Swiss-Prot record:
Binding site for ATP 2: 707, 746, 748, 752, 777-780, 820, 832
Native species: Streptococcus pyogenes serotype M3 (strain ATCC BAA-595 / MGAS315)
UniProt name for this protein: Carbamoyl phosphate synthase large chain
Domain MGS-like: 930-1058
HAMAP family, A to Z: CPSase_L_chain_A, CPSase_L_chain_B
UniProt keyword Iron present: no
Amino-acid positions noted as binding Mg(2+) 1 in the UniProt annotation, renumbered to this chain: 284, 298
Family statement drawn from the similarity comment of this UniProt entry: Belongs to the CarB family.
Cofactor binding summary note: Binds 4 Mg(2+) or Mn(2+) ions per subunit.
Length: 1058
């Protein structure tokens, strides 16, 4: 069927900020979809609130709106643009929920707008637990016994009838939010109460638990002519009971017989046809390991995390084809872009194994609840491809960047057997490493299977890895053992450890025997047809399919998995860098390990290597491709950390040189550089042990800011008030980086701002200064940032520009650089310099219109700012006000304190832009879901050092009609100053303590600060977590509360008696 001519203008709804459960896979899907629709000649209008994505670049759609994804704003854009149709299935759960809201509000009917892709009835049938159950019964598809409840009592009655354990699944939530497995009535009450609150329709499904079954996923496509196919089937390493986003996953399925595979395939196709989905869909099934019994778990009627994985695993571009199906094209008339000859109707076949391992944030959140269940906790994921399961698993392990090069954590060799068994049974994010340790200690795989319900096939593969380790121990320097270890994915580093040698010795031994990896092509058809894609993975076999090009090439290193501190912003910079390399006439090669992102879409670069970002894997690609040089500036800390080793191996690092990167990262060299350049910084010292640190703090004076050198996202950074706290910090935190010392700095409590600059070594372009709303002490990634600055005098801005210029030239910076400043008493100090692209690059590029990563790349390749038509110095400011606001995922992470501090905690960001600061702030707060009512009750619980400042805020809240409530000490202080506040009880006073008031909906906002000492106050944490659970706006920095107040005041009319 040809594409539709009756629609011209299509609106695509994006997925908003990155949160746990909805990450960069939707940037990838949305980008693909917009480009596909433009390719077919439609006019595309995009709405998304996330500035950090490629998707919100001007060239991706005909018109791009970076506005809050709320009914109020989307409605206004629709009325302004009048699209003929809306495509909501590429914006994750956010897009689907927005489509439902637009429909319920009557907006779609009113303006005669059609929904493309999946009809509302199908979304409803798949998402509404009751309708889904009815449909499955009609289709004769088995689902676990279940009931729909709207109250906790109904849940308890049902569970008493069928027995525990049961699973709670709230309707219309994302990433299993609010759900869980309950083994007792007490757990059931707690989880159901929370789940009903989080479900927008106050509805939960309570079902018999089938934990322990195999979890299988089918990624299916269907078009309007009822053609349907399976793109990819995947099998979870972990059995049912752990969210698929938190499971290790293999593609294709590994343990199913042909009969089982056909049975589940038929079920998946039957379901997508019954739902009449046009586009992509993901079906999750549970299979009994001991019989042919299976259950349908759930259906996602949209492009999902699994479809991004399936696209990258097979090379089949699901989102692109789904967008074309939505406008009427059929699978049998679209060419598969990988082969260029076969049609999209042809099911992909794989002659390799793909492994996906999730990346968790627990290196940042040491106190977080690490046990896995039906609620997702991972921030990102890595994928690796190999010719056997062991190879793909080990490549994925070393892609994680958690300090391991193998499925082994050396620290586990010291734990007791008892702890080992507990960790094997109760799955945490690192269970794979505990399982491998158990096998090394001689536990049989049969024992482990009965404890974990993980299939023997997978455990046998872990055993095989251990057997190869033992073989290597017995045969040191043995060539055949080395070849075998390499064939099964062992890294040089691991083999060197076993043989007690240096990694370079193993590399030399390999080279002397010409033992190099070959690169195989991902071609969707198991080499049955010629493929045209330059998409490769390494393996140790005979035939190499990647041919070095005759054109000069440049290798760009990506940023690996998404984690807190290193998000999609770095992928944005990578993709832009590639565009600039191609424009300059070179071949652009990307190397990355993240399946969710745009950079690993094979159509972005001239060649894509899907490989771990380790020295060995990068060198192997360099040995084959012989690029002119490597760019490390855009891959975050991941790429920067490889620069030294690559440079020592004789690789040309383009842009800022390694010794200059070192001058910015190494404390003593940096201090020396600042002194020479005449730039002030907070007084500080380096310490390698406890005595030195105490000596430094004594000399500088408390409070001090302590942190390890060479880290990203403020990991293990703390503000310390006294000697005791400092000793405790050193004893617990220095393990963050043993070979690097810790830095002890004077802590300056002033205004923070940051600058991204682009330098060619002689001139420096400063696109803009971003002023932070929160004062120093809150990590820059967690602060709200304003551009252009609202409270910095012209003189201070000139000083900042001057210091930035001196730094860029003094550090021989070529390309990007980020500098953070703190201002106190009109004095500007430099806090830190990062000689690379930072997380603010996409935001600043969008608000200034300067394609920063592209310009930086051109400078790295030898052009000057003058050649490109840019002046030296600070770029003229924008007329609008733009706010970048952080977005957190605390609802997904139990036991993580939401108090903001020097360690980064946000997972994503949104942007608000308008003609005034107040309007821009309003949009930013709406976009990050901090909606505050015009009046109500606000609770203040304030540390002594901020009470005076909090008092003026409380007075302003009262003036606009809020009732002030406060805890004992704060209320007493307010009363002394003439402001009366309602007293709230201490934690534990059942009737009116803050958590109780919050639970009953009596509180509209909470302002809670702690002293500089930031002791882990249990009460404060309970208050904060109750606010997070109930979705009550919580301010842990007075500056954020002040910003919110500015918005409320601007929306209030003045009411005075005459």
């Amino acid at each position: 069927m040809p594409k539709r001519k009756d629609i011209q203008k299509i609106m695509v709804i994006g997925s908003g900020p990155i949160i746990i459960g909805q990450a960069a896979e939707f940037d990838y899907a949305g980008t693909q979809a917009c480009l596909a629709l433009k390719e077919e000649g439609y006019k595309v209008i995009l709405v998304n609130s996330n500035p950090a994505t490629i998707m919100t670049d001007k060239e991706i759609a005909d018109k791009v709106y970076i506005e809050p994804l709320t009914l109020e704003f989307v409605n206004r854009i629709i009325r302004k643009e009048r699209p003929d149709a809306i495509l909501p299935t590429l914006g994750g759960q956010t897009g689907l929920n927005m489509a439902m809201a637009l429909s319920k509000a009557g907006i779609l009917d009113d303006l005669e707008i059609e929904l493309l892709g999946t009809k509302l009835s199908a979304i409803d049938q798949a998402e509404d637990r009751d309708l889904f159950k009815q449909l499955m019964q009609e289709l004769d598809q088995p689902i676990p016994e279940s009931t729909i409840v709207k109250t906790v009592d109904e849940a308890v009655t049902f569970a008493r009838d069928i027995g525990y354990p049961v699973i709670v699944r709230p309707a219309f939530t994302l990433g299993g939010t609010g759900g869980g497995i309950c083994s007792s009535e007490e757990e059931l009450c707690e989880i159901t109460e929370n789940g009903l609150k989080l479900s927008p329709v106050t509805q939960c499904l309570i079902e018999r638990s089938i934990a322990g079954f195999k979890e299988i996923e089918y990624e299916v496509m269907r078009d309007s002519a009822d053609n349907a196919l399976v793109v990819c089937n995947m099998e979870n390493f972990d059995p049912v009971g752990i969210h698929t986003g938190d499971s290790i996953v293999f593609a294709p399925t590994q343990t199913l017989s042909d009969i089982e595979n056909q049975m589940l395939r038929d079920a998946s196709l039957k379901i997508i046809r019954a739902l009449k989905i046009e586009g992509g869909c993901n079906v999750q099934l549970a299979l009994d390991p001991y019989s042919f019994k299976y259950y349908v778990i759930e259906v996602n009627p949209r492009v999902s995390r699994s479809s991004a994985l399936a696209s990258k695993a097979t090379g089949y571009p699901i989102a692109k084809l789904a967008a074309k199906i939505a406008v009427g094209l059929t699978l049998d008339e679209m060419i598969n872009p990988i082969t260029g000859t076969t049609y999209a109707m042809f099911e992909p076949a794989l002659d390799y194994v793909v492994a996906k391992i999730p990346r968790f944030p627990f290196d940042k959140f040491e106190h977080g609840e690490r046990q896995l269940g039906t609620q997702m906790k991972a921030t990102g994921e890595v994928m690796a491809i190999g010719r056997n399961l062991e190879e793909s698993l080990l490549k994925a392990c070393r892609s994680l960047e958690i300090g391991v090069c193998h499925n082994e954590m050396t620290s586990l060799s010291n734990i007791s057997d008892e702890e080992l068994v507990t960790k094997v049974i109760k799955a945490q994010d690192d269970r794979l490493f505990y399982l491998s340790e158990a096998i090394r200690r001689g536990y049989s795989i049969e024992e482990l299977e009965s404890l974990t319900k993980i299939d023997l096939f997978f455990l046998d593969k872990l055993l095989h890895i251990v057997e190869i380790e033992q073989e290597l121990q017995m045969h040191v320097d043995h060539l055949e053992s080395l070849k075998k270890a390499k064939r099964y994915g062992f890294s040089d580093q691991k083999i060197a450890e076993i043989w007690q040698k240096d990694e370079s010795d193993i590399r030399a031994m390999r080279h002397s025997h010409s033992l190099y990896p070959v690169y195989k092509m991902v071609d969707t058809c198991a080499a049955e047809f010629d493929a045209k894609t330059p998409y490769f993975y390494s393996t140790y076999e005979l035939e190499n399919e990647s041919v070095q090009s005759n054109k000069e090439s440049i290798l760009v290193l990506g940023s690996g998995p998404i984690r807190i501190g290193q998000g999609v912003e770095f992928d944005y910079a990578t993709v832009h860098s590639v565009k600039a390399i191609q424009k300059a006439g070179y071949e652009a090669i990307i190397m990355n390990s993240n399946p969710e992102t745009v950079s690993t879409d094979f159509s972005v670069s001239d060649k894509l290597y899907f490989e771990p970002l380790t020295f060995e894997d990068v060198m192997n690609v360099i040995d084959l491709e012989q690029p002119k040089g490597v760019i490390v500036q855009f891959g975050g800390q991941t790429a920067i950390n490889l620069a030294q080793a690559l440079s020592e191996a004789g690789v040309t690092i383009l842009g800022t040189q390694v010794e200059d990167l070192d001058r910015a990262e190494d404390r003593d060299l940096f201090e020396k550089a600042l002194k020479e350049l005449g730039i002030p910084q907070p007084q500080g010292q380096t310490a390698t042990n406890e005595e030195e640190a105490l000596e430094a703090a004594k000399k500088i004076g408390f409070p001090v800011l302590v942190r390890p050198s060479y880290v990203l996202g403020g990991r293990a950074m703390e503000i310390v008030e006294n000697k005791e706290d400092l000793i405790e910090y050193i004893r617990t935190a220095v393990k963050a980086s043993p070979e690097h010392p810790i830095l002890v700095d004077s802590y300056i409590f002033g205004k923070e701002c940051e600058v991204d600059a682009i330098s060619d070594g002689k001139s420096v372009l400063i696109p803009g200064i971003m002023e932070h709303i929160e004062r120093a002490g809150v990590h820059s990634g967690d602060s709200m940032a304003v551009y252009p600055p609202q409270q910095l005098s012209k003189q201070i801005q000139e000083t900042i520009a001057e210091y930035t210029k001196r730094l860029a030239i003094g550090l021989n910076c070529i390309g990007m650089m980020n500098v953070q400043f703190v201002i106190k008493n009109e004095q500007v100090y430099v806090i830190e310099v990062n000689p690379r692209a930072s997380r603010t690059v996409p935001f600043l590029s969008k608000v200034t219109g300067i394609p920063m990563a592209q310009i930086a790349t051109k400078l790295i390749l030898g052009q000057t700012l003058k050649d490109l038509g840019y002046e030296d110095g600070l770029y003229p400011q924008s007329q609008l006000v733009h706010i970048k606001a952080p977005v957190f995922s605390f609802t997904k992470l139990a036991q993580v304190d939401s108090l903001l501090g020097p360690e980064m905690k946000s997972t994503g960001e949104v942007m608000g832009s308008d003609t005034s600061l107040e309007k821009a702030l309003y949009k930013a707060f709406e976009a990050n879901n901090s909606h505050l009512s015009e009046f109500g009750q606000i609770v203040f619980t304030i540390a002594d050092d901020s009470k005076a400042e909090a008092l003026s805020l409380a007075r302003r809240f009262k003036a606009i009609g809020y009732q002030i409530m406060a805890t004992q000490g704060t209320a007493a202080y307010f009363a002394e100053q003439g402001l009366s506040a309602c007293l709230v009880g201490k934690i534990g006073d059942a009737a009116n303590d803050i958590p109780t008031l919050v639970r009953h909906g009596h509180v509209q906002a909470i302002v809670n600060t702690v002293g500089i000492k930031r002791t882990a106050d249990k009460d404060g944490q309970m208050i904060r977590s109750s606010a997070i659970e109930q979705g009550v706006p919580l301010f842990t920095a007075l500056d954020t509360a002040k910003a919110m107040l500015t918005v409320l005041e601007s929306r209030c009319f003045n009411i005075e008696a005459i």
